[in-house]
Regions:
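Signature of the chorismate-utilizing enzyme
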Residues: 1-196
Length: 196
C-alpha cells in the first residue's frame, strides 16, 4: 500500500479519479497499457458493496480467443434436453501478452480446459501474503462462451473465430475507494513503481 488518505463521502469519487488519471496521461505510455478496468460499487453501502476498485495501467494480459471449430451437426433443443456432448471440455490456448508501446505476444499456454489453463498461470502471480487486499492477482472478464472450456458441450452456434472469450490482466496496481471508511488506498506489487 502506497498511500492512505481520507476523502469525502461520494460514491462516484472513483469515476472522478479515473477521469483525472486519463487527463494526466497516467494510463498508457511509460506506465503501461491504456486498458481500463473499473469494479464500481454503487447503490446502498454494505459489506458487499464497500469498495470500488480501479486497476492501474496493466503490463501483462492473458487472452483466450474462439478457436476454429465445426458447428455441431446435431440440431436439437437444449430446452428439451437435446444437448450435443463431447467426451471432454474443449482445450484452450491462453495468449500471454506484455505491454511495450502495444501488446506483444510472449508465449502461449495450452490447457486441457479452463481450470488447467488457469492453474498454469499461477507461476505468473506473486505469492499471497496474509488475507488483506493485495495487488498482483488476475482481474478481467470471461464471456459465457467460455463454458465450452468448462463443460463437454458442443455448440450449435459457436462464436466467430478469433472472438475474444476471456481477457484477464495481471493487476499489479489498484486504487481502492472504501466507501464506508471514506478512504483511498493505492496498492502496487511492483517494486519502486513510478506510477504510484
Amino acid at each position: 500500500m502506497k498511500a492512505l488518505c481520507e476523502v469525502e463521502e461520494r460514491d462516484d469519487l472513483i469515476l472522478d479519479l479515473l477521469t483525472q488519471l486519463r487527463d494526466e496521461g497516467m494510463f498508457g505510455g511509460i506506465h503501461g497499457a491504456p486498458d481500463e478496468l473499473l469494479l464500481h460499487s454503487g447503490g446502498p453501502q454494505s459489506d458487499l458493496s464497500q469498495r470500488s476498485l480501479l486497476m492501474g495501467p496493466a503490463r501483462r494480459r492473458y487472452i483466450v480467443r474462439q478457436p476454429s471449430i465445426e458447428s455441431s451437426s446435431a440440431i436439437g433443443s437444449p430446452l428439451r434436453g437435446e444437448i450435443d456432448l463431447q467426451p471432454h471440455p474443449a482445450p484452450m490456448k491462453i495468449h500471454v501478452e506484455n505491454w511495450d508501446d502495444g501488446w506483444t505476444s510472449q508465449e502461449i499456454i495450452f490447457g486441457t480446459d479452463l481450470a488447467d489453463g488457469l492453474r498454469q498461470l499461477s507461476h505468473h502471480l506473486p505469492l499471497a501474503q496474509g488475507d488483506a487486499f493485495q495487488a498482483g492477482g488476475l482481474a478481467g472478464l470471461l464471456t459465457y462462451d467460455m463454458v465450452q472450456h468448462t463443460e463437454p458441450l458442443r455448440f450449435q452456434h459457436p462464436p466467430d473465430e478469433d472472438s475474444i472469450l476471456m481477457i484477464l490482466y495481471l493487476a499489479d496496481r489498484w486504487i481502492v475507494h472504501d466507501r464506508i471508511e471514506s478512504t483511498i488506498e493505492i496498492h502496487s506489487s511492483i517494486d519502486n513503481d513510478g506510477w504510484v
